């Protein structure tokens, strides 16, 4: 059972919303109309020639008026959503049996009439029957929690106890209990959770009357996660399981209830998050075909699982789903080995659903798809009902393609939130496997209106004219203005006068050290770093960095010292680059912490390491490096030609609009929705800081939000210090201790100064010049070739590359 893992929002009423947008090409006049969005060739028109999907899955969203509703544990029984309420924070808030009617949109809550003597009760698993009665596995603790007994209980729909029995002996006190299921005959299956170890993992079997039958092991030492269940026939249940940490396949196991064993039906079942069975009428069922609806505890009855028309579901036995798509799948008939690959039906985002947080998927009597979503971080907890509708009958939207590398759940959440908020535009996230794939897609003119700038070399793409200038949009925005942002944020993403992107949050990476090493220099230059390294031959110049990483950092900040893109001249055979290679050769090939090895602070204290990489996600992070370098600590920056701009800014949720997009106005609306500070401005200070720390996981770009955060930290630390309390410490394995203190305004100012002089991070390992260096330099590092020979090879290869790409 999932735990109550976040402070609930205020109780909200049932909320209905219906969207009817489909990602399809608009008519020839499908531009934004007047304003900034006009002109250009729409990248999305590239998909107009592709076959339009015949079906659209139009969503309707419901929210149950219960702040203790657990969408992750809801079970569909007919047209009723059944669940056990989550444990409340207040004393005396017992869990209740809850039923929400999808037809009447009514919530019924029933208290349990417990027959147990123990007062401290914990429901750790449950399964509802077709008649809305429920089986529970209950942990019952003594008053001091020193004793534990386990019970299998059944309650009728009104909360009256029908039966209970002590199952402590067969289930044990230390076993890890997961989900439950009830098959078509009412028999009970209790699964161990994914935390069960080795041979302890398995299934406890109980008859429909609750009598213990056996425990059947999964028979593997690997971690086992139960994905879902389906009835293979009236006589047996099949369980889909995932074995190991990163499995390529799932396995389908048939439970032989009477034989007390598991039979492997399919060892290479698709690797999925969940599955849903399409119930067929007896006349349609073939030998070995599945015959009942899947849901943990959903059971089987003609009333609750009447088959939808095949026209609505397609010719499939099962529907499967993962983070991004829903698939149709034909399970092979009994005794047959051949199977078809899953067929993609639709993407979750097509229906404004973040598939990373789908908890359950099933089919209603009328053929609609039932989906539950529980995303605490983005406050998206709901039931979605999807109606299969012909695309031609759906009002079209203007579809915008957002190109991203390995777009994650957070990006999907932004797209879903935007798509639900309005009817004119839709964001479709297009994933690319690597930055190289993305760059190639841009080069070949693939459809895209927005680009996720995470790790992207914006300077290089700007030279190719890829981006639209965002400043005119920002200046005309009704909700944002240039002065709203922390000083330096807009400058960081302004390339040759063009504002490429605006992050909603950021983190910083720079080099920290003893500022006295710099002499009179304001910042660390490449020349000065090489001199310092030469003067300290026994010391590692920068701690905890590999050769490849060091070369990438140096090229990120100093590539222009060796390439003149205007003239095409390259200088990789120069004495300066040879000195760089000698410098990089002092770093390790890999980072391995050996037993008993001294910590980085101790090495710095002893002079064995001169500088350290500094990561800054909050203003107080500066104190760690003050603890390493003492009173003369400073953020000196990565080495650059003139000692300025030596800080990397890692952007959160920064998006650029492509110059070829016809829907620039719609693309800007999406960016506005990401940056809009209204919600954060309405939060109480403590809630705001919590949100920044755990959701942004970085520093906010909006100045008002940054100021409120810093004010809270300063005041909170002042109050803490006034009470005479300490601020904690960081202890290393060798005993070195860094003590923390109350945050100071000077430390905040240090962080803000770094922002003013930062440059956007990009993934240098995807840079073609860095790749060439990485391929050739190891021959020098390993002593296979001379420094001069390797430098000449790099010079020739890079020169050829520059000549081809100028």
Give the residues covered by each predicted segment.
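Conserved N-terminal structural module of periplasmic/extracytoplasmic solute-binding proteins
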Residues: 21-91, 95-104, 120, 126, ...
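Extracytoplasmic/periplasmic substrate-binding proteins
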Residues: 100, 589-672, 677-682, 687-696
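Helix-loop-helix "hinge/cap" segment bordering the ligand-binding cleft or interdomain interface
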Residues: 101, 156, 213, 494-596, ...
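Extracytoplasmic "Venus flytrap"/periplasmic binding protein-like
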Residues: 424-485, 494, 517, 603-604, ...
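Short helices/loops that flank or line small-molecule/ion binding pockets
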Residues: 436-451, 459, 531-535, 589, ...
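Hinge/lid segment of periplasmic solute-binding proteins
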Residues: 458-510, 524-528, 632-639
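Short, solvent-exposed loop/beta-turn-alpha elements that line the ligand-binding surface or hinge
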Residues: 471-484, 560-581, 637-648, 756, ...
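C-terminal capping/gating helix-and-loop segments adjacent to ligand/active sites or protein-protein/ligand interfaces
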Residues: 649, 716-798
């Amino acid at each position: 059972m999932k735990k109550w893992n976040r402070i609930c929002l205020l109780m909200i009423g049932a909320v209905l919303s219906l969207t009817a947008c489909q990602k399809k090409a608009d008519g020839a006049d499908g531009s934004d109309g007047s304003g900034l969005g006009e002109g250009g060739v729409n990248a999305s028109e590239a998909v107009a020639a592709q076959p339009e999907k015949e079906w659209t899955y139009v969503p309707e969203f419901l929210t149950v008026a219960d702040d203790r509703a657990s969408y992750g544990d809801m079970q569909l029984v007919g047209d009723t959503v059944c669940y056990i309420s989550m444990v409340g924070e207040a004393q005396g808030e017992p869990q209740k049996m809850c039923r929400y009617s999808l037809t009447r949109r009514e919530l019924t809550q029933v208290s349990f009439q417990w027959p147990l003597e123990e007062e401290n009760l914990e429901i750790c698993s449950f399964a509802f029957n077709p008649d809305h009665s429920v089986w529970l596995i209950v942990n019952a603790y003594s008053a001091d929690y020193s004793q534990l007994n386990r019970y299998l209980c059944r309650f009728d729909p009104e909360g009256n106890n029908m039966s209970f029995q002590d199952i402590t002996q067969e289930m044990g006190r230390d076993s890890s209990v997961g989900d439950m299921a009830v098959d078509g005959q009412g028999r009970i299956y209790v699964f161990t959770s994914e935390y069960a170890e080795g041979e302890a993992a398995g299934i406890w079997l109980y008859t429909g009357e609750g009598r213990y039958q056996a425990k059947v092991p999964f028979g593997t030492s690997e971690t086992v996660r139960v994905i879902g269940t389906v009835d293979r026939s009236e006589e047996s249940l099949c369980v889909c399981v995932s074995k190991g940490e990163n499995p390529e396949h799932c396995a389908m196991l048939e439970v032989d209830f009477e034989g007390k064993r598991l039979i492997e039906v399919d060892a290479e079942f698709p690797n999925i998050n969940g599955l849903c069975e399409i119930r067929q009428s007896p006349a349609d069922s073939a030998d070995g075909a599945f015959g009942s609806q899947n849901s943990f505890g959903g059971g089987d009855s003609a009333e609750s699982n009447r088959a939808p028309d095949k026209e609505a579901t397609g010719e499939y036995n099962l529907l499967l789903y993962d983070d991004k798509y829903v698939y149709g799948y034909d399970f092979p008939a009994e005794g047959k080995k051949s199977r078809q690959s899953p067929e993609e039906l639709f993407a979750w985002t097509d229906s404004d659903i973040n598939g990373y947080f789908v908890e359950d998927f099933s089919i209603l009597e009328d053929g609609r798809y039932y989906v539950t979503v529980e995303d605490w971080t983005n406050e998206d907890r709901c039931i979605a009902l999807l109606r299969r509708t012909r695309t031609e009958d759906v009002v079209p939207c203007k579809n915008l393609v957002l190109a991203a590398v390995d777009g994650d759940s957070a990006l999907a959440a932004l797209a879903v939130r935007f798509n639900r908020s309005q009817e004119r535009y839709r964001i479709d996230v297009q994933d690319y496997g690597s930055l190289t794939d993305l760059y190639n897609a841009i080069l070949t003119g693939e459809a895209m209106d927005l680009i996720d700038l995470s790790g992207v070399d914006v300077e290089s793409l700007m030279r190719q004219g890829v981006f639209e200038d965002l400043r005119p949009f920002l200046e005309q925005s009704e909700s944002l203005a240039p002065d709203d942002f922390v000083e330096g944020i807009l400058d960081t993403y302004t390339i040759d006068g063009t504002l490429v992107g605006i992050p909603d949050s950021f983190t910083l990476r720079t080099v920290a050290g003893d500022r006295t090493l710099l002499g009179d220099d304001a910042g660390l230059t490449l020349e000065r770093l090489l001199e310092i390294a030469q003067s300290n031959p026994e010391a590692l110049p920068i701690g905890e960095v590999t050769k490849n990483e060091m070369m990438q950092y140096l090229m990120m900040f100093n590539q222009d010292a060796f390439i003149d893109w205007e003239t095409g001249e390259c200088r990789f055979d120069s004495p300066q680059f040879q000195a760089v290679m000698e410098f990089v050769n002092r770093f390790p090939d890999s980072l391995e912490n050996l037993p008993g090895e001294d910590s980085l602070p101790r090495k710095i204290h002893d002079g064995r390491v001169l500088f350290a990489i500094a990561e800054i996600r909050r203003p107080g992070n500066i104190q760690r490096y003050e603890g390493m370098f003492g009173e003369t600590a400073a953020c000196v920056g990565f080495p650059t030609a003139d000692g300025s701009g030596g800080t990397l800014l890692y952007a959160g949720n920064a998006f650029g609009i492509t110059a070829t997009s016809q829907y620039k106005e719609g693309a800007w609306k999406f960016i506005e929705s990401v940056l809009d500070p209204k919600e954060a401005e309405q939060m109480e200070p403590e809630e705001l800081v919590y949100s920044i720390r755990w959701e942004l996981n970085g520093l906010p770009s909006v100045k008002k939000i940054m100021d409120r955060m810093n004010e809270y930290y300063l005041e909170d630390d002042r109050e803490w210090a006034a009470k005479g309390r300490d601020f904690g410490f960081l202890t290393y394995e060798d005993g070195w201790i860094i003590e923390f203190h109350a945050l100071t305004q000077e430390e905040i100012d240090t962080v803000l100064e770094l922002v003013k002089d930062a440059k956007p991070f990009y993934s240098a390992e995807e840079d073609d010049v860095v790749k060439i260096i990485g391929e050739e330099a190891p021959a020098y590092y390993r002593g296979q070739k001379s420094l001069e020979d390797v430098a000449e090879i790099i010079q020739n290869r890079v020169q050829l590359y520059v000549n081809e790409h100028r």
